[in-house]
């Protein structure tokens, strides 16, 4: 129906509408390329057993920004899902940094306790969600039961994938 009215618009207005549409497409393509390039850089970190503190801070900031972007774009809750193959040292330190940014130093003991008593670590992927390190399968069941739509950024050894 909108196309029927579009054909009756003056040429200048048609051109302006088309240019705006093309700008949006180009902006989206540019952003996707930037995300792919950044993911490629951080994929190298997922292969390492030992990572510098600066890399942890950058990776944590990247994952926070990426999950916020996709949560807003898809209108879904976005989980950063860590596969078993990623070095424990890397994933714990990134989750610790995320926790620190949310809650500050005063609440860090709770995260340390969760790490020590983590349930079913060998059986499933983990995610940091609302102040705790959780089993992804259990969290997905809860989200499904509550009708919460979610998507995942999956961190595996040597890859970062977006699962919508």
UniProtKB/Swiss-Prot annotation:
Coiled coil: none annotated. Keywords: Host-virus interaction. Residues 9-22 are annotated as: Binding to host SKP1 protein. A motif (LXCXE motif, interaction with host RBR) lies at residues 111-115. It comes from the Viruses. Interacts with host SKP1. Interacts (via LXCXE domain) with host retinoblastoma-related protein 1 (RBR1). Interacts (via LXCXE domain) with retinoblastoma-related proteins (RBR). Interacts with and disrupts the function of host retinoblastoma-related proteins RBR, which are key regulators of the cell cycle. Induces transcriptional activation of E2F-regulated S-phase and G2/M-phase-specific genes. Inactivation of the ability of RBR to arrest the cell cycle leads to the stimulation of viral DNA replication. Belongs to the nanovirus Clink protein family. This is Cell cycle link protein. It comes from Subterranean clover stunt virus (strain F) (SCSV).
């Amino acid at each position: 129906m909108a196309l029927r009215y579009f054909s009756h618009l003056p040429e200048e207005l048609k051109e302006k509408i088309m240019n705006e549409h093309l700008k949006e497409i180009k902006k989206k393509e540019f952003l996707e390329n930037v995300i792919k390039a950044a993911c490629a850089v951080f994929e190298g970190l997922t292969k390492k057993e030992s990572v510098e503190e600066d890399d942890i801070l950058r990776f944590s900031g990247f994952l926070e920004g990426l999950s916020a972007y996709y949560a807003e774009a898809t209108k879904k809750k976005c989980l950063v899902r860590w596969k078993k193959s990623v070095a424990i040292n890397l994933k714990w330190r990134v989750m610790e940094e995320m926790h620190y940014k949310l809650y500050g130093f005063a609440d860090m003991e709770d995260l340390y306790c969760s790490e020590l008593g983590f349930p079913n670590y060998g059986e499933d992927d983990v995610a940091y969600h609302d102040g705790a390190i959780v089993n992804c399968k259990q969290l997905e069941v809860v989200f499904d039961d509550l009708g919460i739509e979610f998507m995942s950024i999956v961190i595996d050894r040597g890859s970062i994938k977006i699962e919508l």
